C-alpha cells in the first residue's frame, strides 16, 4: 500500500510503500539510515544488512542525496526518532538518480543558497517555514470567514497609486500607463460599501530600494475593510486576528516550531487585548531611553520600533501618528488636527510593523481637500471619490504583511526565507 509520511501513525506494524526523496543518509557498520522526505514530512528509513542482504545494503549505502525513490518497509513507532516513526526498510526502487547535488549538509553562504532557492526549498528548515506560512494563510481565511467577511479580489494592475507615492512599478497597458498594485485598499473600500465586511489576500509590489531584513519588493498582504467600524473597533479585530494566527500555529505547527528552535514561551503570551500607546507617548518613551535622533514628526526607524516593542511582551499598537507622515485617506483626530486616526501594530522581538491601519475619510469635501494637499489628480481618483458622493459611512481597514508575520511567529531572522521565491533589491532569480 502506498502512503505518505504524514500518514505513518495510521500504519504502525504494517508494510507500506512511500514515494520520497533522499534528504540525507549515514551508515554505521551494518546499518544504513536514510532520511526521507515526501513533502508531507520527514522520516528515517533503517536498512539492516542482516535483514536485506549484501546487494541491497550496498545499493542503499550508494544512494545519493536527493535521489527519488520508492521505499518499502514496515512502520515502527520510535520515540527516539526526531519524527516519531521509522521505517524498517525491506526494499528500495530508484526512480531518478541525483548526481552532484549542490546543497550538501555542510554550511553554505546566503548568496549561494539564494542562487539555488529552487533547491533550498527542499531543506528541513525551509519545509518548516513554508508549513507555518501555509498555516497562517489557512487560519486567516478561517478567521475572516467565521467573522462574516466576504473575500474580494482587487486588481493587481492599476491606473494610480493608492497612497500617492512614487514607489511604483510602471508598465504599459496597451496605450495607457499602468502600475503594479501597492495595495488593494481603495478597491476594498468600494467593496465594503457594497458588502459591509470584506478582506483580500494577494501580492503587492513596492519599488523600495531597501536591503533590510524586513523588506521584500514583492510580498503578500491580507487587507480587510469594514463599514461602520471606528478605529477602536478595527483595533479589536486586529488583535483578535493576530492572536488567532499565533494560536493556530501553536496548535498545528508545534513540530515545525521545534525544528526551527523557536522559543514558544513568547508566543504563548499572545492573547488579546494588546497594549496601546500614542505616537506622542512613543516619542517620549524613546527620549527617556536615550534616543536623541528622533523628534516629534519623524517616522520611526527599525531601532525605534524595536526599543518601543521591547517594553511589552505582546505586539503593541502605536496610534495617532502625525498627519504629515501618513497617507491622504486618514481622517484627522477631532481632538487634535495634527494627528490622524490610525495605528501600526509593532511585533515584539525586533520584527517591527506587521499591521498598518486607520479609519478612512468618508466626507467628500474633506477627502478632496486632503487630495489637494497631496497634489493628487482627482480625475484619476474620480471613481474613489464616488464612494464619498454616494452614501459613504464611517469605515476602517488595515493591512497585514504576511512575510513579516511569518518571520515573527516562526522566529526567522530575514523575510527572504518566508516566501518561496523572494524578490529582493538585487535579486530576480530564480
UniProtKB/Swiss-Prot annotation:
Its main location: cytoplasm. Pfam families: tRNA-synt_2, tRNA_anti-codon. It comes from the Bacteria. GO terms for molecular function: asparagine-tRNA ligase activity; ATP binding; catalytic activity, acting on a protein; nucleic acid binding; transferase activity. Signal peptide: none annotated. InterPro entries: Aa-tRNA-synt_II, aa-tRNA-synth_II, aa-tRNA-synth_II/BPL/LPL, Asn-tRNA-ligase, Asp/Asn-tRNA-synth_IIb, NA-bd_OB-fold, NA-bd_OB_tRNA. The keyword Disulfide bond does not apply. It is an enzyme of class 6 (ligase). It is found in: Cytoplasm. The keyword Metal-binding does not apply. One of its GO terms (cellular component) is cytoplasm. HAMAP family: Asn_tRNA_synth. This is Asparagine--tRNA ligase. The lineage of its organism: Bacteria, Bacillati, Bacillota, Bacilli, Bacillales.
Amino acid at each position: 500500500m502506498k502512503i505518505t509520511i504524514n500518514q505513518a501513525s495510521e500504519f504502525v506494524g504494517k508494510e507500506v510503500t512511500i514515494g520520497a526523496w533522499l534528504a540525507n543518509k549515514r551508515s554505521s557498520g551494518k546499518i544504513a539510515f536514510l532520511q526521507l522526505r515526501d513533502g508531507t514530512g520527514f522520516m528515517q528509513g533503517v536498512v539492516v544488512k542482516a535483514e536485506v542482504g549484501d546487494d541491497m545494503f550496498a545499493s542503499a549505502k550508494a544512494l545519493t542525496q536527493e535521489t527519488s525513490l520508492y521505499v518499502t518497509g514496515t512502520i515502527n513507532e520510535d520515540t527516539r526518532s526526531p519524527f516519531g516513526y521509522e521505517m524498517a526498510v525491506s526494499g528500495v526502487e530508484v526512480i531518478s538518480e541525483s548526481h552532484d547535488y549542490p546543497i550538501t549538509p555542510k554550511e553554505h553562504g546566503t548568496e549561494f543558497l539564494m542562487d539555488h532557492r529552487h533547491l533550498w526549498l527542499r531543506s528541513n528548515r525551509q519545509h518548516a517555514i513554508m508549513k507555518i506560512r501555509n498555516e497562517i494563510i489557512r487560519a486567516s481565511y478561517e478567521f475572516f470567514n467565521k467573522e462574516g467577511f466576504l473575500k474580494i479580489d482587487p486588481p493587481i494592475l492599476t491606473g494610480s497609486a493608492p497612497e500617492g507615492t512614487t514607489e511604483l512599478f510602471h508598465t504599459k497597458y496597451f496605450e495607457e500607463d499602468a502600475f503594479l498594485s501597492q495595495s488593494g485598499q481603495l478597491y476594498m473600500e468600494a467593496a465594503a460599501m457594497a458588502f459591509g465586511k470584506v478582506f483580500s489576500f494577494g501580492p503587492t509590489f513596492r519599488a523600495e530600494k531597501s536591503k533590510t531584513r524586513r523588506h521584500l519588493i514583492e510580498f503578500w498582504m491580507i487587507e480587510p475593510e469594514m463599514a461602520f467600524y471606528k478605529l477602536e473597533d478595527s483595533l479589536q479585530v486586529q488583535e483578535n486576528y493576530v492572536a488567532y494566527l499565533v494560536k493556530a500555529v501553536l496548535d498545528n505547527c508545534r513540530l515545525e516550531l521545534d525544528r526551527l528552535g523557536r522559543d514558544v514561551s513568547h508566543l504563548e503570551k499572545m492573547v488579546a487585548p494588546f497594549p496601546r500607546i500614542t505616537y506622542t507617548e512613543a516619542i517620549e518613551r524613546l527620549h527617556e531611553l536615550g534616543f536623541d535622533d528622533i523628534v516629534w514628526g519623524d517616522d520611526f526607524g527599525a531601532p525605534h520600533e524595536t526599543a518601543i516593542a521591547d517594553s511589552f511582551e505582546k505586539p503593541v499598537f502605536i496610534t495617532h501618528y502625525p498627519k504629515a507622515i501618513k497617507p491622504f485617506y486618514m481622517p484627522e483626530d477631532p481632538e487634535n488636527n495634527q494627528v490622524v486616526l490610525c495605528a501600526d501594530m509593532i511585533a515584539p522581538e525586533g520584527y517591527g510593523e506587521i499591521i498598518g491601519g486607520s479609519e478612512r475619510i468618508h466626507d467628500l469635501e474633506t477627502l478632496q481637500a486632503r487630495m489637494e494637499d497631496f497634489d493628487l489628480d482627482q480625475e484619476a481618483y474620480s471613481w474613489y471619490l464616488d464612494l464619498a458622493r454616494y452614501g459613504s459611512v464611517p469605515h476602517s481597514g488595515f493591512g497585514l504583511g504576511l512575510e513579516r508575520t511569518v518571520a515573527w511567529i516562526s522566529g526567522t531572522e530575514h523575510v527572504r526565507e518566508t516566501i518561496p521565491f523572494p524578490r529582493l533589491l538585487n535579486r530576480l532569480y530564480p
